């Protein structure tokens, strides 16, 4: 199995699915009618184990071959569709097929595209099972937070499973000479989220100050968090939510922005701008 930065589990594993179902059932039974719960947030950034959302274990290899057999029926049909004879990649046995990875074939375009489709469908099915479990004792709406234009997952199909669309918005403000291209990109993403279901969505995550994954992470200039938040509202978001409430004391996201900084002060600019947005949204 090839693990990356997080989500170190197999979405095909029957054991993982059963354990997850039991946890979801307990949550549904305990909190499904609680007046303080208004929405089920399923998982967090499905597929967020970095770039390809993939697990490459033997269970996934078997499931992938089964998926391919259902789609193509015969190896001749698969070889023709992938045009695998080029560079002598013709398959003569289903067991010869493995997921594209640094440990094997990763230049066959048909293989890579079908693997992406398989991964998206497997994760969507995993999500579907979680939704079914939490709705056992509850009729609350469900969502899961999408990640911009995260290509490994087919969000158009995922939208069919969700009651509410939500996404994590992190425009790269102040990285270009002109803010307009970034603003246009952000507007496009908000419009896409609204377009999935033709109704308002939730901005599940945003940063009040800075991110932590670029080579240079710029703090939002005075007023930019306000402008960015109001842009989201104007384009269909029903929320301005932040990751994270308090800065982490360590590990990968210790420098990621938060409402409460390491100084735990209410007097700094970031906290004051968050409060400003909150007051205006109450009007």
Model-derived features: positions:
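Polysaccharide-binding and catalytic clefts of secreted carbohydrate-active enzymes
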Residues: 4-164, 168-175, 179-188
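Carbohydrate-binding surfaces of carbohydrate-active enzymes
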Residues: 90, 94-97, 162-163, 170-283
């Amino acid at each position: 199995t090839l693990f990356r930065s997080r989500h170190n589990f197999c979405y095909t594993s029957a054991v993982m699915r059963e354990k997850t179902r039991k946890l979801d059932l307990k949550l549904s039974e305990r909190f499904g009618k609680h007046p303080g719960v208004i929405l089920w947030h399923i998982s967090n950034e499905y597929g967020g184990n970095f770039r390809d959302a993939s697990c490459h274990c033997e269970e996934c290899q078997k499931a992938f071959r089964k998926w391919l057999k259902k789609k193509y029926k015969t190896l001749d049909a698969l070889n023709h569709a992938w045009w695998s004879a080029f560079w002598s990649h013709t398959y003569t046995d289903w067991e010869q097929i493995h997921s594209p990875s640094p440990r094997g074939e990763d230049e066959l375009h048909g293989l890579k595209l079908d693997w992406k489709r398989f991964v998206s469908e497997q994760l969507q099915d995993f999500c579907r099972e979680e939704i079914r479990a939490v709705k056992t004792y509850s009729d609350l709406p469900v969502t899961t937070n999408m990640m911009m234009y995260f290509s490994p997952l087919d969000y158009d199909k995922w939208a069919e499973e969700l009651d509410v669309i939500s996404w994590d918005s992190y425009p790269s403000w102040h990285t270009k000479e002109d803010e307009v291209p970034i603003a246009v990109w952000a507007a496009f993403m908000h419009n896409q989220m609204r377009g999935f279901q033709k109704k308002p969505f939730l901005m599940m995550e945003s940063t009040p100050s800075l991110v932590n994954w670029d080579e240079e992470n710029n703090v939002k200039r005075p007023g930019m968090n306000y402008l960015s938040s109001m842009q989201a509202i104007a384009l269909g978001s029903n929320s301005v939510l932040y990751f994270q409430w308090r800065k982490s004391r360590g590990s990968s996201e210790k420098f990621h922005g938060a409402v409460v900084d390491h100084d735990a002060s209410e007097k700094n600019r970031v906290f004051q701008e968050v409060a400003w947005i909150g007051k205006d949204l109450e009007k």
